[in-house]
Design a protein with these regions (language model features):
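Aromatic-glycine-rich donor-binding/catalytic loop that engages nucleotide-sugar donors
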Residues: 196, 200, 237, 351-354
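A short beta-to-alpha transition loop/helix N-cap that caps and shapes the active-site region
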Residues: 54-56, 148-151, 238, 307-308, ...
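Short, flexible micro-motifs
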Residues: 28-31, 78, 104, 122, ...
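N-terminal Rossmann-like NAD(P)+-binding domain of SDR-like oxidoreductases, especially those catalyzing
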Residues: 6, 10-232
Length: 394
């Protein structure tokens, strides 16, 4: 039964290549797809997930899509005994557990820090202090493109520039694009490499930066290969459509399915890199399997930018083809929001042979919409916006 700690040792597999794997956050969006792929490859998988009600609903029941061939433990990464009993016989640890929500992290500061930073610290402390009692050979942590702040930019000459965040005074006049701090000219967005200086602009982003730096640092110190994967904007089936702080594709889908306009800040031409969850899973598998990933950081994206307005229009065309809903471009802004950020994937392509396979327009969005149309999401966008607004964050 979920939540009980009468754990059996992870079973041995006949194939010597099969391993025992723990996935924290394995009932969530990315984690559950990763679990499916690991089970399919013959690995023995254990899931540790607290079934956060913001993601899984107030009854905190395991989702129907949870793989029946994986062992499920309902518990918190901050519970020392639960965490240790889940990880002590694992070979590989995928740390996906986290609270996710850039805006919400700016007022639920303690809880985001507790779960994301202290939860990771708890896991690493067990690795460090019980070294003789475990045989974990690799740890992989889910990081985020949010730690970059703004993406990379260049001048017309091609010279790279790392401008500061746009000042509120600029955006109050509807001047949305990034300006050269020296000349005032509009800068051109460029692919963002892993080497770009980090500029986290939210408590969530700060926590993600801390997670990856702690994992890499402790991994090096104890010679446990560690990998940090900086996810860009992930979309696909199993996104929490009723969570108003999740990805924009899910938020828009929830609005559209409830007959309401997706609300877009600024002018809608701000851009992100949207990657399908199946491609994110493949990146994780490559990082687990290849020594070239050890102690490295990788962007996990497509290398292509897409405007937020285009995403909204694509979802409307498929979820509300009659045209009863149109995007609502409000020309408002959220302080600290970035304008453009898309991935430079040359490193993960070169080192791990990764190539994104799912195109947003020709397959990815269709799968998301087919799944979303079968759901009955509760639209909580306005409730979340009020929470941000009363704190002056919108």
């Amino acid at each position: 039964m979920p939540g009980k700690l009468m754990l059996l040792p992870m079973r041995e597999q006949g194939d010597n290549m099969a391993e025992k794997i723990l996935v924290t956050g394995g009932a969530g969006f990315v984690g559950s797809h990763l679990v499916d792929a690991l089970v399919e490859r013959g690995h023995t998988v254990r899931i540790l997930d607290n079934l956060d009600p913001q993601v899984h609903g107030p009854d905190r029941k395991p989702p129907v899509y949870l793989n029946p061939d994986a062992e499920f433990v309902q518990g918190d990464v901050l519970d020392t005994e639960t965490l240790w009993r889940c990880m002590c016989d694992a070979d590989v640890l995928f740390h996906q557990a986290a609270r996710v929500g850039v805006g919400q992290s700016m007022y639920e500061i303690l809880d985001y820090t507790r779960v994301n930073v202290l939860g990771t610290a708890k896991l690493l402390e067990l690795l460090a202090n019980r070294r003789s009692k475990h045989h974990i050979r690799k740890i992989l942590v889910a990081s985020s493109m949010s730690i970059y702040g703004e993406g990379a930019y260049c001048r017309a000459s091609g010279e790279a520039v790392s401008p500061p965040l746009r000042p509120d005074a600029q955006m109050e006049h509807g001047a949305w694009e990034m300006l050269d701090p020296e000349t005032g000219e509009v800068l051109r967005a460029a692919p963002t490499p892993e080497s770009k200086p980090l500029q986290p602009t939210s408590v969530y982003a700060i926590g993600k930066r801390d997670q990856e730096e702690m994992v890499l640092s402790v991994g090096r110190a104890y010679r446990i290969p560690a990998v940090a994967l900086r996810y860009f904007n992930i979309y696909g089936p199993r996104q929490a459509l009723s969570n108003p702080y999740t990805g924009v594709a899910a938020i828009f889908s929830s609005r559209i399915l409830n007959g309401r306009a997706p609300v877009i800040y600024e002018d809608g031409l701000q851009s992100r890199d949207f990657i399908h969850v199946s491609d994110v899973v493949r990146a994780n598998l490559l990082a687990m399997e290849k020594e070239e990933a050890d102690y490295e950081v990788f962007n996990v994206g497509t290398g292509r930018a897409r405007s937020i307005l285009a995403v909204a229009q694509g979802l409307i065309a498929r979820l509300c083809p009659g045209g009863g809903v149109q995007p609502k471009v409000e020309r408002k802004f959220r302080s600290g929001d970035i304008r453009h950020c898309y991935a430079d994937i040359s490193k993960i392509r070169r080192s791990l042979g990764f190539e994104p396979l799912v195109d947003f327009d020709t397959g990815g969005i269709e799968g998301l919409c087919a799944w979303a149309a079968e759901q009955e999401p509760e639209d909580k966008f306005e409730e979340a916006t009020k929470e941000l607004g009363k704190r002056g964050l919108v």
